Amino acid sequence: MQVKNPILGLCQKATFALSAAKVEQCPDDQGYEVAFAGRSNAGKSSALNTLTHASLARTSKTPGRTQLLNFFSLDDERRLVDLPGYGYAKVPIPLKQHWQRHLEAYLGSRECLRGVILMMDVRHPMTDFDKMMLDWARASGMPMHILLTKADKLTHGAGKNTLLKVQSEIRKGWGDGVTIQLFSAPKRLGLEEAYKVLAGWMELEDKPVA
């Protein structure tokens, strides 16, 4: 008898729901949401597209162009949320400040938010933004799972060494509440582990399939 993770089927059926410039425009605050965060060019959109087997999240050659909260429905009560990229976008400072205010408002107010997937480029982990997100997760008690993206850019050994180093730094600075893994969108590395995290947060049990 096979055991199938039901989150896989839901992710494959993911559809775009809406974009929100501010919290008031978000869907009703009920059900289950998992948010995807990351510094610009950390591979957030590519990871989302790989997890959903679709081109839902916009990828751009200009990092940081995700300016809105983008919601994707898995079913009637479960959603993935693509948060604005942080960093390199060539936009006026007031607009960046606008993004940050509404990002903070979203993270601080959504009762249905069950966890945050934080993307870090495995070659440049633990940026100031990453540490800020880790501080927020610790202070709020929000579960956080880190994808060390672009693992295909390093050798297997170098990737494992970076994973262990970042794990150690996080454990010392933020405790044991944060989980972490290697991930590569082009190589589809780490998909099963990421799906298990999503299933747990969205309260989907593994179900036997005949």
Curated annotation (Swiss-Prot):
One cellular-component annotation, GO: cytosol
Gene Ontology BP, a term: division septum assembly
Molecular function GO labels: GTP binding; metal ion binding
Keywords: Cell cycle, Cell division, GTP-binding, Magnesium, Metal-binding, Nucleotide-binding, Septation
SUPFAM superfamilies in UniProt: P-loop containing nucleoside triphosphate hydrolases (SSF52540)
Binding-site positions, GTP: 38-45, 64-68, 82-85, 149-152, 182-185
Cofactor requirements of the protein: Mg(2+)
UniProt cross-references to InterPro entries, sorted A to Z: G_ENGB_dom, GTP-bd, GTP-bd_ribosome_bio_YsxC, P-loop_NTPase
Domain EngB-type G: residue ranges: 30-204
Residues annotated as binding Mg(2+): 45, 66
Highest rank taxon of the organism: Bacteria
Task performed by this protein: Necessary for normal cell division and for the maintenance of normal septation.
Protein family membership: Belongs to the TRAFAC class TrmE-Era-EngA-EngB-Septin-like GTPase superfamily. EngB GTPase family.
Name listed for the protein in its UniProt record: Probable GTP-binding protein EngB
Gene name linked to the record: engB
